[in-house]
Amino acid sequence: MGDWGFLEKLLDQVQEHSTVVGKIWLTVLFIFRILILGLAGESVWGDEQSDFECNTAQPGCTNVCYDQAFPISHIRYWVLQFLFVSTPTLVYLGHVIYLSRREERLRQKEGELRALPAKDPQVERALAAVERQMAKISVAEDGRLRIRGALMGTYVASVLCKSVLEAGFLYGQWRLYGWTMEPVFVCQRAPCPYLVDCFVSRPTEKTIFIIFMLVVGLISLVLNLLELVHLLCRCLSRGMRARQGQDAPPTQGTSSDPYTDQVFFYLPVGQGPSSPPCPTYNGLSSSEQNWANLTTEERLASSRPPLFLDPPPQNGQKPPSRPSSSASKKQYV
């Protein structure tokens, strides 16, 4: 096997900008795929062609039967699977690096604009444009990029591509080899003169390895699907929170009708502490309220001394009498 160190370093950088499910997927890829294949792959499949024997001495028959039995070696097929499945993740890493470099350039440009002594309209407009561009790049407090906006689209697309590629390679493995390694392969292909029986070395061990890689592939596929569900739920929750923030009701005291559910009281007025308080306005009709106002005015008039004394009557004239209470009451009714 070749050196996987470079690919591991690249995928390790992706782990810093992935979700929890994405980190688990990378762990499965590192430990149960690349590491196991690198350690045990050569020892299990190293004798794949050398120990493939057929019961014929016809020159070239063994080679053509091996080609028919294994169109591509299992171990090379799995290496191609790892490379293709990792490619969408590397594309996402490229987008992360691009946004990180862009955010650094925007911060540098913002610092240069703020350092200018004179603030003319052009500088203000340029600074506002830089701030708008920086607002599109969401950076956490620890310096990691948040998966939002365009980065979210790239991440979802990468997970979708990984799922499709994973399912495609699993289907291809089933079509090419099946899920078991048969100990005897029957071949009929030119230049073989007749049906030839070919024998595979250590078929049981290879069957166990095939099943192990199949289970790991299914786990990776399930993790990709779970990550899609996780991303969908995250997007829906953010949308619901944003909608609730827009549709939030106004705070108490800011109602459009300032007199809603308010009761107005009249202060009690009387000659002594035992005087009954005046009833509320909301509890009386208009006629009853007028009568109550009239009674209050009469009490006030009787308790205050007159401000001006009337002149004595002359020539036998009678002093003008007060208007009758009935006439006064009529004007309030």
From Swiss-Prot:
Residue stretches spanning the membrane: 21-40, 77-99, 149-165, 208-230
Protein name: Gap junction alpha-4 protein
Region (Disordered) residue spans: 292-333
Effect of P319S: In allele CX37*2
Family note: Belongs to the connexin family. Alpha-type (group II) subfamily.
BP GO annotations: blood vessel development; cell-cell junction assembly; cell-cell signaling
Signal peptide (UniProt feature, chain positions): none
Alphabetical list of InterPro entries matching this protein: Connexin (IPR000500), Connexin37 (IPR002263), Connexin_CCC (IPR019570), Connexin_CS (IPR017990), Connexin_N (IPR013092), Connexin_N_sf (IPR038359)
Function: One gap junction consists of a cluster of closely packed pairs of transmembrane channels, the connexons, through which materials of low MW diffuse from one cell to a neighboring cell.
Keywords for the protein's UniProt record, in alphabetical order: Cell junction, Cell membrane, Gap junction, Membrane, Transmembrane, Transmembrane helix
Compartment annotation: Cell membrane; Cell junction, Gap junction
Primary location class: membrane
